[in-house]
């Protein structure tokens, strides 16, 4: 069973969801290079500083925290395969099968990488994440994290600390979805952005209460639709 097995983004749940939480190989080194050996296993999505991770070590400025695991892509064919990170503190680079998939800076924001073109058509795939967290030495937002906890400050947390998951989507898929209810006007405004805006994509919005449809409307991507 995965830690935190629930779908992390219920407003855009897809059936192709594959949870990558669980044991990963890890190593803490002084280099950004792929480690020659692994220090053991870390339980993602808990930071190495947390007891729940099974590690209990503090990542120091200048050190690199490496994660590694194998995975099988979501079932199905065609479309795109997206790799989602709920959050990684602070800066990271991600490789799939030895090729750079992308990176991210900022410890509090989710990010997504399209890894379709990096996948092997058969067999298992490898995922490597290299992380740095210059707590106390950089200009990044840190809240109350510090390497010298005390008073209102708590120990710094590093690395992957939110769910990691895969999903398979169509070539043109819903990228962002915003639902704005207006109780007084008795309307719901639905804002949908697709991955390839401007295409001839029809969208259908349905509002249900207790299993009963109370409103529905059609529209196109990049357009607002109000259901009354």
At which residue positions do the language-model features occur?
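Short, solvent-exposed loop/linker segments at the N-terminal edge
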Residues: 180-186
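Conserved small/polar residues in nucleotide/adenosyl-binding loops
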Residues: 227-228
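N-terminal helix-cap/turn-to-beta initiation motif at the start of protein domains
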Residues: 12-21
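N-terminal glycine-rich cofactor-binding segment
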Residues: 48-56
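Accessory beta-strand-rich segments of carbohydrate-active enzymes
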Residues: 5-11, 25-31, 57, 61-174, ...
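Structural beta-strand segments of beta-rich domains
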Residues: 81, 186-192
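Predominantly extracellular/luminal regions of secreted and cell-surface proteins
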Residues: 20-45
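The feature marks proteins involved in alpha-glucan
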Residues: 44-48, 151
């Amino acid at each position: 069973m995965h830690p935190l097995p629930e779908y992390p983004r219920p407003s855009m749940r897809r059936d192709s969801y594959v949870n990558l939480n669980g044991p990963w190989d890890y190593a803490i080194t002084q280099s950004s290079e792929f480690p020659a050996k692994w220090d053991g296993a870390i339980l993602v999505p808990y930071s190495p500083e947390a007891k729940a991770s099974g590690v209990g070590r503090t990542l120091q400025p200048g050190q690199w925290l490496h994660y590694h695991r194998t995975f099988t892509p979501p079932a199905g064919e065609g479309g795109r395969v997206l790799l989602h990170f709920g959050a990684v503190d602070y800066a990271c680079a991600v490789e799939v099968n030895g090729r750079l998939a992308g990176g991210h800076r900022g410890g509090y924001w989710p990010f997504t990488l399209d890894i379709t073109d990096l996948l092997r058509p058969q067999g298992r795939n490898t995922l490597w994440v290299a992380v740095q967290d210059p707590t106390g030495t950089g200009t990044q937002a840190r809240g109350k994290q510090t390497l010298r906890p005390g008073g209102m400050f708590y120990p710094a947390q590093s690395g992957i600390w939110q769910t990691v998951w895969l999903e398979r989507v169509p070539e043109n898929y819903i990228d962002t979805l915003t639902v704005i209810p207006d109780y007084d006007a008795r309307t719901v405004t639905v804002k949908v952005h697709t991955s390839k805006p401007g295409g001839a994509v029809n969208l259908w919005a349905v509002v249900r209460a207790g299993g009963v449809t109370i409103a529905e409307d059609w529209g196109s991507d990049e357009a607002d639709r109000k259901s009354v």
